[in-house]
Swiss-Prot record:
Catalyzes the ATP-dependent conversion of 7-carboxy-7-deazaguanine (CDG) to 7-cyano-7-deazaguanine (preQ(0)). The keyword ATP-binding applies. Coiled coil: none annotated. Zn(2+) binds at C192, C202, C205, C208. InterPro entries: QueC, Rossmann-like_a/b/a_fold. The gene is queC. Binds 1 zinc ion per subunit. It comes from the Bacteria. Pathway: Purine metabolism; 7-cyano-7-deazaguanine biosynthesis. Its cofactor is Zn(2+). Keywords: ATP-binding, Ligase, Metal-binding, Nucleotide-binding, Queuosine biosynthesis, Zinc. This is 7-cyano-7-deazaguanine synthase.
Length: 229
């Protein structure tokens, strides 16, 4: 990107390669000049990152990948292969929660926004059809927004960043409908917590369950490639 965007307002979009973040990118492109930001953080399945690279390329946006070794800490089924990804619903915060992940990701996005002069950060957190992660709640986003006002040059100078959460109060079905309206090709996306090397989904984890149900409720054919059972 070389530090330059076009003439439209600028935004950093967190892009995992999954359904929600890809919908966010399409939504953001209708409003902003976008840079997509992804993370290699030691996640169990890296095919989502392959998907993110392809999605960003097809969308024609600059894409940066940040390397962080959260697997060195473990503490989650997504970063520790000794912890199984559950295939049944769990009470409380599930073992697929990665400690402080959104805080870490948003902090990098905040730095990128300052460096590249972005006015907004777009993240696909959702508090309706989600797995119960504490860093996907409205009060978390508000708290991070308040922190960013205090911790950044832009905030101190009276030009605080906007944190856009277009999916926050949408059901998975309505997220899919929004993406379809913006031309999203969901066959490119990978949502599964334990997708195989070809990006095929297990069809059993919580992320797969929410995704499957979303397509059913949206009345849209599910383009997901599943591992043969």
């Amino acid at each position: 990107m070389n530090g330059e965007f076009g003439m439209r307002p600028r935004a950093i979009v967190l892009l995992s390669g999954g359904l929600d973040s890809t919908t966010c990118l399409a939504w953001a492109q209708a409003r902003y000049e976008c840079m997509a930001l992804s993370f290699m953080y030691g996640q169990r399945s890296t095919t989502e990152l392959d998907a993110a690279k392809a999605i960003a390329q097809n969308a024609g946006v600059e894409h940066r990948v940040i390397n962080i070794d959260l697997a060195n800490l473990g503490g989650s089924a997504l970063t520790d292969h000794n912890i199984d990804v559950p295939e049944q619903l769990q009470e409380g915060i599930p073992v697929t929660y990665v400690p402080a992940r959104n805080t870490i990701f948003l902090s990098y996005a905040l730095a990128a926004a300052e460096v590249f002069g972005a006015e907004a950060i777009v993240i696909g957190v959702n508090a309706v059809d989600y797995s119960g992660y504490p860093d996907c709640r409205p009060e978390y986003i508000q708290a991070f927004t308040n922190m960013a006002r205090l911790a950044t040059k832009a905030g101190v100078e009276g030009k605080p960043l906007t944190f856009e959460t277009p999916l926050l109060h949408l059901s998975k079905a309505n997220i899919i409908r929004l993406g379809i309206e913006h031309g999203v090709d969901y066959s490119q996306t990978v949502s599964c917590y334990q997708a195989d090397a070809q990006g095929r989904a297990c069809g059993k984890c919580d992320s797969c369950r929410l995704r499957k149900q979303g397509f059913i409720e949206a009345g849209v054919t599910d383009p997901t490639r599943y591992i043969p059972q």
